[in-house]
Curated annotation (Swiss-Prot):
Cysteine-cysteine disulfides: none
Protein name as annotated: Ubiquinone biosynthesis protein COQ4, mitochondrial
Lineage: Eukaryota, Fungi, Dikarya, Ascomycota, Pezizomycotina
Catalytic reaction annotation: a 4-hydroxy-3-methoxy-5-(all-trans-polyprenyl)benzoate + H(+) = a 2-methoxy-6-(all-trans-polyprenyl)phenol + CO2
Function: Lyase that catalyzes the C1-decarboxylation of 4-hydroxy-3-methoxy-5-(all-trans-polyprenyl)benzoic acid into 2-methoxy-6-(all-trans-polyprenyl)phenol during ubiquinone biosynthesis.
Membrane topology category: Peripheral membrane protein
Keywords: Lyase, Membrane, Metal-binding, Mitochondrion, Mitochondrion inner membrane, Transit peptide, Ubiquinone biosynthesis, Zinc
One protein family per Pfam: Coq4
Length: 285
């Protein structure tokens, strides 16, 4: 074999494939020990692998314990990018009220909403309905987790706004915070916002009792899909400006159909169950 050919073979045999220097540099810059600076206060940048792990872990954890609001919040942030939270942000940008919300950046908390003022409003007003729901469920406006894992600062606010408005959705629909009520409301939110977390939360229906699952499939699922698709996008509601409006008028304006009172249904079912047990014991004795 000619020397030049042998030399060429040796040269090919010693070739090494190297990554572009820019790729190596970016990988070094974005490691667990050396992250890029946050884009806003409290922001925690994540790699694609970390975001996937967060999504899987929080999904499993929240399914095992649907009351873990922190895991549900993490699941919402991990699955909202790269598409869905931008779609929701664009829906706000295409709406005059949504644009004002993005410009004003209002927050919903006990510091921005006076509970005393809300209780002074007419019984059928949005504000009174909201505070009455808070009192009945034993919760407050400060219970929402702060967004940390969404990279875009404006989209982080959109997620925060959705999160802080969640209790208004509860109040307007009348759904309680029991797992059955949360699954029904999350189904409505999925049809209305398309956020993946709201759709994934529907898997919690597996943890419901048989009679609750039957009620979900026959009553709440059809209501949620019908009302969620037909109503205007609730992310564009400036709730702070609707507090004095009649709640039925707002439902009609948004196209939201109120479902049957779930708490009353559950109370009635418990009474019927107790009556049946009492009758059975009386018959046996």
């Amino acid at each position: 074999m000619p020397p030049t050919v042998r030399q060429g073979i040796r040269t090919v045999g010693t070739l090494r494939v190297t990554r572009p220097s820019s790729y190596v540099l970016s990988s070094r810059e974005f490691s667990v020990l050396n992250r890029p600076p946050p884009n806003y206060p409290g922001h925690i940048p994540l790699t694609t692998i970390e975001r996937g792990a967060l999504a899987v872990g929080s999904a499993i954890g929240s399914l095992l314990n649907p009351r873990r609001a922190d895991l549900i919040a993490a699941l919402g942030e991990a699955t909202a990018t790269p598409y869905f939270i931008y779609r929701l942000r664009d829906a706000m940008l295409s709406n005059p009220t949504g644009r004002r919300i993005l410009r004003d950046r209002p927050r919903i908390s006990s510091k921005t909403l006076s509970v005393e003022y809300l209780r002074s409003l007419p019984p059928n007003s949005v504000g009174r309905t909201y505070v009455s729901w808070l009192d009945r469920e034993g919760v407050g406006p400060d219970s929402r987790e702060t967004v940390r894992y969404i990279d875009d600062e404006e989209c982080a606010y959109v997620m925060q706004r959705y999160r802080e408005c969640h209790d208004f959705y509860h109040a307007v629909t009348g759904l309680p915070i029991v797992v059955e009520g949360e699954v029904a409301l999350k189904t409505f939110e999925f049809a209305n916002t398309l956020l993946p977390m709201t759709g994934l939360s529907m898997f919690a229906v597996m943890r419901l009792k048989p009679e609750e699952r039957e009620r979900y499939w026959e009553l709440h699922l059809p209501w949620a899909v019908r009302s969620g698709l037909a109503s205007k996008e609730v992310i564009n509601v400036y709730w702070e400006e609707e507090l004095e409006r009649d709640v039925n008028e707002l439902r009609e304006k948004l196209g939201i159909e109120k479902p049957p009172d779930l708490r009353e249904i559950r109370k009635m079912m418990r009474r019927q169950k107790k009556a049946a047990e009492a009758a059975r014991e009386k018959y046996q004795n």
